[in-house]
From Swiss-Prot:
GO cellular component, one term: plasma membrane
Matching HAMAP family: KdpC (MF_00276)
Species whose genome carries this gene: Enterobacter sp. (strain 638)
Membrane topology value: Single-pass membrane protein
Keyword Transmembrane attached: yes
Family per record: Belongs to the KdpC family.
Keyword line: ATP-binding, Cell inner membrane, Cell membrane, Ion transport, Membrane, Nucleotide-binding, Potassium, Potassium transport, Transmembrane, Transmembrane helix, Transport
An example Gene Ontology molecular-function term: ATP binding
Protein name: Potassium-transporting ATPase KdpC subunit
Self-association state and partner proteins as the record states: The system is composed of three essential subunits: KdpA, KdpB and KdpC.
Length: 191
């Protein structure tokens, strides 16, 4: 009986600390210091939620830059089913999927002269990538420019404005947030 009382008190104390105090404290600090991130990094335009800066979207229209393929179950870019395909590099199913993606990208981007960037035909581990490297974005510029009836230079300028360079040159590559880039192109059309 002498051991039971301290055990119950410790259980109650740890439940209050780890189940109540700690979550409340981290939520409060997150809301205070990182308000945008704690609320999903949402992109709000004209009072309307257009998406998140951190989750890709399934852009299929020729006017939009397309992100990496999504391997999420059910529907592309489903945030409730985040995860990769888990197909081995030697799996014929993966080989066929990549072949189909290359053929579809070549058909949709006949102006592209270089090989299709690997990033555009392979899904990421999360299946929800929101950004692409400059190489993959540049490969799509002729298609997007033609579909929007803009010059490649006009589109390239918007791409450069939305390209994030790495903090240190030898760590990482320049990337563009595809959701923000496509929204910027839409906004340019309205102006």
């Amino acid at each position: 009986m002498t051991m039971l009382r301290p055990a119950i008190l410790l259980f109650i104390l740890l439940t209050l600390v780890t189940g109540g105090l700690y979550p409340l404290l981290t939520t409060a600090l997150g809301q205070w210091w990182f308000t945008d991130q704690a609320n999903g990094s949402l992109i709000i335009q004209n009072g309307e939620n257009r998406g998140s800066r951190l989750i890709g979207q399934n852009f299929t229209d020729a006017r939009y830059f397309q992100g990496r393929p999504s391997a999420t179950a059910g529907s592309p870019y489903n945030p409730m089913a985040s995860g990769g395909s888990n197909l081995a590099g030697s799996n014929p199913e993966l080989d066929n999927a990549i072949g189909e993606r290359v053929a579809a990208l070549r058909a949709a981007n006949p102006q592209a002269s270089r090989d299709v960037p690997v990033e555009l035909v392979t899904a990421s581990a999360s299946g929800l990538d929101y950004s692409l490297t400059s190489e993959s974005v540049a490969w799509q510029i002729p298609r997007v420019a033609a579909a929007r009836q803009l010059t490649t230079e006009q589109v390239r300028k918007v791409v450069e404005e939305h390209t994030q360079k790495p903090l240190v040159n030898f760590i990482g590559m320049p990337v563009a947030n595809i959701v923000e880039l496509n929204l910027a192109l839409d906004a340019q059309r309205k102006n």
